[in-house]
Amino acid sequence: MQEIQPPEKRTTLPRKRILIVNCYFDDSRQPIRRTNKIPQAVGPIYLAGAFARDTCDVRCYTEVASGPLEDEGLLSWPDMLVLTGLTNGFDRMLHLTAYARSKNPKVIVVAGGPPVRALPLFSKKVFDYACLGDIEELCDVISEAFGPAYVAKRMLPRYDLAYWLGRIGYVETTRYCNFRCSFCALTAEGRSYQTYDLEHVRQQIMASGKRSRMFFLDNNFYGSDRNHFRARLGLINEMRGAGQFHHWGALVTNDFYRSNENLRLVREAGCELLFSGLESFDNDWLRSFNKLQNTSSPQVEMVTKSLNAGVVFAYGLMLDVTSRSISDLRRELDFITSTPEITIPSFITLSIPLLGTPYFYDCVEKDTLLPNTKLRDMDGTTVLQKPLDDIAEVVRFVDDLQSLKGFHSRVLKHAAGFARLYRSKLTKMQMVLALGSNLLTCAQPISTSFSGLGWLKTRPRPRTFVSSTEPLDHMYTPAFRVDSRFESYFKPTMVTDDIGQLHEDIIQSGLLEIHAPRQSVARA
């Protein structure tokens, strides 16, 4: 007689709750929600793809579109808090860590991104896991913290969690850049340009669902692999034919424009807009920052070539008050706004000596950093270094830049001239994309925020636009009661001390050994 075996005992794994946050300080230093900002942050949805759906409940939050995270209920919810963000958002990571640990002492805090990679020792002291590698490192963290069953078998972006994206999809087809500009955080990290397998790109596009427009978030969509570039265009044509999206845009370096064939190929593939880091119309300044790819052809010629080919040319302008006079910078802005043949910059930023970059070390060597500069001040709207001109004149100039004050009539005249020149060569949407940036710049910060008017009533102190005296954001005051052991988490991370030398926060952070070999994940 066959022996009857007892039924197999099944074990159900407990579900883990994961909160992933893109940490952000707004340039206005107010709690503004940038719901209209393009591009939006997508780091959280890429990180969310590391968690297994059948064992993890994942929520994403971006402080860019939703404002500062101060919801006690949400911050007490997760078993694991995953934090990412830009370099100057490091202190927000500390704030959210303090909030979450005050609500749940057992919460596991994981942090990564540029600030963590720049400050590895500092990060190891405050986070349970300081991830110093690519986003795939999170899979190793999950496996160690919870077990392999909580790791997704295939890591794809969780577009279903991206409540803030709207009709625009975001996909990455390559990683890093093949150039080494001295002010770029990618140069500081020294990582090589990488291409993705086309099947992985296809899977991302399919996972995003059908969108009216797709934006490719590569650091350099053109890159150094010409065959892969053409293959991606072939895939784009295939996906457009299947109705996944209709039009698209991307970020490219200026060497893309050396070949007229490139413009023809992207236009035939449905490209509406390309963003390129033009930075300046001053070739001497570009050479000083190793931005050599921008000096091979005249900037105006490059912009007009793109527009005449039916592709909007978008760019940012970097104004360096430490090496150029205010009168020189004003002349550059006068030139741009009086030249309707070109677009006006989508944004204007001051030069930023980001941690670990050649530019940062050059500033340290030349002793140009102002006293009491905070890491949070590295936002592109705050004077961090000793300027050529009188500081009062520089402050007035920087203040005016926030809305192009003094240039409004020139911008309107430029827009009218631009429309006359290109209305037969660009679609209506392209005209909106091209001219919208001009007019929206004049309306900052309201233009990219439905809650933009709120800051007019809540601003406690006026900005000084100088790092040494700039008031702290309200986020440095806890939004609710936190454990006293986290008091230091709400003090700003300092870059320089009161005499302008590197602060102990930086000296002890691991930054100065940034090029030394290190593990990809540092466990506290």
Give names to the regions the model predicted.
Residues 47-153, 352, 356:
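Glycine-rich beta-alpha loop elements in corrinoid/cobalamin-binding modules
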Residues 2-14, 24-27, 31, 132-173, ...:
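N-terminal [4Fe-4S]-dependent radical SAM core
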Residues 120-125, 262, 323-338:
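Catalytic cores of alpha/beta
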Residues 27-30, 118-119, 179, 224-226, ...:
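Flexible glycine/acidic-rich beta-alpha junction loops that bind and position SAM and/or redox cofactors
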Residues 157-314, 319, 334:
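Radical SAM [4Fe-4S] cluster-binding motif and immediate context
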Residues 82, 131, 215-217, 275, ...:
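Conserved beta-strand positions in the central sheet of alpha/beta enzyme cores
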Residues 29-44:
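Glycine- and acidic-residue-enriched helix-capping/strand-helix junction motifs
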Residues 1-20, 32, 53-55, 73-80, ...:
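Radical SAM enzyme core and accessory elements
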